């Protein structure tokens, strides 16, 4: 798949001096290695200083510890490789069913769809490998489901909920960064409902994620892997990182700077169930287009400015007009257009939401809107 494209980071409140923020999906290229510390031609030699000659016994895991979480989750996280001739890419995935259904990011496997015609190989924690095929994709949400061939004894991951997460909550990330399968990192939830705009690795189609932000180390290859709570329950799908841009022309991706983003599992699980049952997913729509804020510009007002309203759509039926400014969705403050897109996409078609709207006269009122749904078109 090659290095994924960098995309625009969410607007920040202050300029960065001497360093640009870049946001990238975190699938990795095959064959790049970890860097000069690893030599693929010869094994690394590690010299132990003062080590005892007897083999130490594993330390028993403390209940609720990262060690216990890792032991529970690792068998349910896989490494995914997509090969297209001499090119390839890699990422991670989580096990949904004993017979081989796996959840991952669309950008991990999209190059194996349609004319891409790449071959997908999945490797389990025990080293077992098998081919896989795409069940369905939703590029707009960066979600895909694939199925590993000839499986019946996989260990599905425990599904949690992203509805009651809290900033500061401890979390664990599991995946295959830089091809290092079964890597476990830990951190906290740094923020919730973070609008994150990313570009697809192959198609270039953008996704706006309503993301969980974490400082757990996430690197290229972690895409599609698990973000879990301290009960070992899946709460998010790791998808993107922010990194400091450099002047390098090599195309290499930067690593973690403590700004990782995951798709909340409640949204991902709704979509994966639609993909499994019908092969396509639906997306909630408000029926508006939004005035974009130029990249790098600071907003002069708070809210998402409505540029146009689709006749007969949900916003039109609620009396929202072009030029209006949406400042809240339910109790959530909407500072800009990406925030409105992320908030709407976090809902399911048919959900009724409350919008706080400022009209052209400066007056503010609240309207109830029932979201419509559209089918996301994406080939297998």
Features from the language model and the residues they span:
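A conserved glycine-rich beta-strand in the N-terminal activation segment of trypsin-fold
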Residues: 12-20, 60-66, 81-99, 129-133, ...
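Interdomain regulatory linker/hinge segments that flank or connect interaction modules
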Residues: 38-42, 51-57, 239-291, 374
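Terminal peptide-recognition signature
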Residues: 30, 34, 75-80, 93, ...
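C-terminal recognition in membrane/secretory proteostasis and scaffolding
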Residues: 1-44, 133, 270-380
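Conserved active-site neighborhood of the chymotrypsin/trypsin-like protease fold
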Residues: 82-89, 97-182, 338, 343, ...
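Short, conserved beta-turn/loop elements at beta-strand boundaries and strand-helix junctions
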Residues: 98, 137-141, 192-198, 239, ...
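N-terminal activation segment of mature serine protease catalytic domains
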Residues: 30-92, 273-277, 377
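Active-site loop architecture of trypsin-fold serine endopeptidases
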Residues: 84-89, 108-118, 154, 174-186, ...
């Amino acid at each position: 798949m090659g290095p994924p494209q960098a995309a625009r980071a969410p607007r920040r409140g202050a300029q960065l001096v001497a360093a640009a923020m870049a946001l990238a999906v975190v699938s990795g290229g095959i064959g790049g290695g970890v860097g000069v510390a690893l030599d693929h031609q010869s094994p690394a030699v590690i010299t132990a200083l003062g080590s005892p000659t007897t083999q130490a016994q594993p330390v028993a895991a403390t209940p609720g510890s990262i060690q216990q979480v890792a032991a529970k989750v690792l068998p349910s996280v896989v490494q995914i490789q997509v090969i297209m001739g001499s090119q390839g890419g890699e990422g991670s995935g989580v096990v949904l069913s004993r017979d081989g259904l796996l959840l991952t990011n669309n950008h991990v496997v999209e190059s194996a769809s349609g004319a891409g015609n790449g071959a997908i190989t999945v490797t389990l924690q025990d080293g077992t490998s098998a081919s896989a095929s795409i069940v369905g994709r939703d590029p707009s949400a960066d979600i895909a489901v694939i199925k590993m061939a000839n499986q019946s004894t996989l260990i599905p991951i425990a599904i949690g909920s992203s509805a009651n997460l809290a900033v500061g909550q401890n979390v664990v990330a599991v995946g295959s960064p830089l091809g290092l399968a079964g890597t476990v990192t830990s951190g906290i939830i740094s923020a919730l409902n973070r609008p994150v705009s990313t570009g697809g690795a192959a198609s270039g189609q953008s996704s706006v994620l309503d993301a969980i932000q974490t400082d757990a180390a996430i690197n290229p290859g972690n895409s599609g892997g698990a973000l879990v709570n301290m009960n070992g329950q899946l709460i998010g799908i790791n998808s993107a990182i922010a990194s400091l841009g450099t002047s390098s022309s090599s195309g290499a991706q930067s690593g973690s700077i403590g700004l990782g983003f995951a798709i909340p599992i409640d949204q991902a699980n709704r979509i994966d169930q639609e993909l499994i049952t019908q092969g396509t997913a639906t997306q909630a729509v408000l029926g508006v287009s939004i005035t974009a804020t130029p990249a790098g510009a600071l907003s002069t007002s708070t809210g998402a400015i409505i540029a146009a309203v689709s006749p007969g759509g949900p916003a039109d039926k609620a009396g929202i007009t072009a030029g209006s400014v949406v400042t809240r969705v339910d109790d959530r403050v909407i500072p800009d257009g990406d925030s409105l897109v992320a908030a709407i996409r976090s809902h399911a078609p048919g959900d009724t939401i409350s919008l706080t709207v400022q009209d052209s006269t400066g007056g503010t009122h609240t309207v109830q809107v029932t979201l419509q749904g559209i089918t996301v078109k994406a080939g297998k």
